[in-house]
Amino acid sequence: MHILLSNDDGIQAEGIKTLAKELRKFAQVTVVAPDRNRSAASSSLTLVEPLRPMKLDNGDYSINGTPADCVHLALNGFLSGQIDLVVSGINAGVNLGDDVIYSGTVAAALEGRHLSLPAIAVSLDGRQHYESAAIIVSQLIPKLYGRLLKSREIININVPDLPYSEIKGIKVCHLGYRAAAADIIKQKDPRGEEIYWIGPIGLAENESEGTDFHAVKNGYVSITPIQTDMTAYHSMTALQQWLDKE
């Protein structure tokens, strides 16, 4: 098996290094990742400047672009040979609920799926036990690979930041959702000019049983199948009826 591995925390992040080491125990792994942290880049592509791959001494590649750029470039002519699976992560911090809209980690996996390959995104609820998440992914790939080949979904995995022996199990979950984000943060630079920072993300608003929030909060790995079709089918008939009213 040949795995393309990317992330949004950057080529030097501990998460991608730990995952690459674990995956290389049973697969050929090619790493193509951003040259710096590109968290919350979502599925953005770089269209107004060239992308410049740099091969590192260990054979990995860094790209001056987004996570989606990395996967798009790798699968559309940059890499030679067949890729069987795209894996993105391990992200430092969860991608639960609404997070998947912004997440560069999830976006890298979605780009792989868009280009007709099975794909997995994996995130850790912290910055400590990357080994736990890496082991979980290596165990799940043989079980999930056949299903992923037959669907247009990706698998979004979130792992509690616990030693592997303390993880309670795995649950298939639907996405929860967060409350609105906090206000932006207004400051002044050394010249007295106003600058702004994006504020903290909203707290979990729906973390009921069955959600990814609930699983991770209670020590379980959450697995959520995600698709790119965002159509709210249940609203289509009502919307059409409303439009048809005189």
UniProtKB/Swiss-Prot annotation:
It catalyses: a ribonucleoside 5'-phosphate + H2O = a ribonucleoside + phosphate. Its EC number is 3.1.3.5. InterPro entries: SurE (IPR030048), SurE-like_Pase/nucleotidase (IPR002828), SurE-like_sf (IPR036523). Its main location: cytoplasm. It is an enzyme of class 3 (hydrolase). Binds 1 divalent metal cation per subunit. GO terms for cellular component: cytoplasm. A divalent metal cation binds at residues 8-9, 39, 91. Pfam families: SurE. It comes from the Bacteria. Its cofactor is a divalent metal cation. Gene3D superfamilies: Survival protein SurE-like phosphatase/nucleotidase (3.40.1210.10). GO terms for molecular function: 3'-nucleotidase activity; 5'-nucleotidase activity; exopolyphosphatase activity; metal ion binding; nucleotide binding. It is found in: Cytoplasm. Nucleotidase that shows phosphatase activity on nucleoside 5'-monophosphates. NCBIfam families: PRK00346.1-3, PRK00346.1-4, surE. PANTHER family: 5'-NUCLEOTIDASE SURE, 5'_3'-NUCLEOTIDASE SURE. Belongs to the SurE nucleotidase family. This is 5'-nucleotidase SurE. It comes from Histophilus somni (strain 2336).
